């Protein structure tokens, strides 16, 4: 019993000295919360993203990325960069012009948080990236996340590791570079544009049209596009009207003319730039823009043509890297 009492006294003395020393553990030490990690810190410390981190540093967007909040980042792995460089005849990220590299990286960033787990029942989602066009307007470029046959970005990039949460947003790992969308990206991938895509395929100049729609814009080397994209129902109605009274030869000519009239290489006409009396030259005909009494924008190819309007006031256009899609309720003809 004496031994136990002695041990108890020694324990109390030891506890007293520990509590009075400067090295004691406080409640704050024991229950200290882990500081949430920023996306930029994660990218900079993970060996799977060394090339992505080098690209961020090389394009001078490090500070920009560090100050973004509530973002979605599709983070390309080293494999993604290696394949991209190989496909473009390069061996180093330094071979990509700095301004192009900055926009390519910003194309992986969306200014809102999107969880892949929330997209199980979503067929298509149009999202605005932080990349901008190289046109005078410098509008933000959109991407399409489709879930028709497995979730993909811009028609070809699957997500490898989804929904990694950080203090300033969410990261989804991808093993392919998400390239800037073109007009063809959306025409290929959007189900609501499938009839228009089929109409182009029926035209005599389908190959040229598709090549133009997917050509990357380079200032001085290619033209900005404005593409009038009719809804599926509008294309069906147009073809039904043709089949009702025309010969096969006339139908083919009408389809060629219709496709040409939806394509303009004149300028990237944003909705805010459309004004009463504006004439847009297309490959098929001049398209006149008018304002109705209720300030609705309408289009026509002549005094006896049908009046064409936007199919919805909620989504009137889609901006891509090489041009803009204006979403209409009828085929311009």
Label each region the model flagged.
Residues 1-8:
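Bacterial N-terminal signal peptides that target proteins for export
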Residues 10, 16-44, 325, 333:
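Bacterial Sec-dependent N-terminal signal peptides
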Residues 37, 174-190:
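Short domain-boundary/entry signatures in modular proteins, especially
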Residues 40-82:
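Post-signal-peptide N-terminal segment of Sec-exported extracytoplasmic proteins
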Residues 60-68, 92-95, 207-219, 246-248:
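Surface-exposed patches in mature extracellular/periplasmic domains of secreted proteins
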Residues 74-84, 162-180, 228-234, 315-333:
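FKBP-type peptidyl-prolyl cis-trans isomerase
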Residues 80-94, 233-248:
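Short active-site loop/helix that positions an aromatic residue
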Residues 86, 91-157, 248-313:
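Aromatic/histidine-rich interaction motifs
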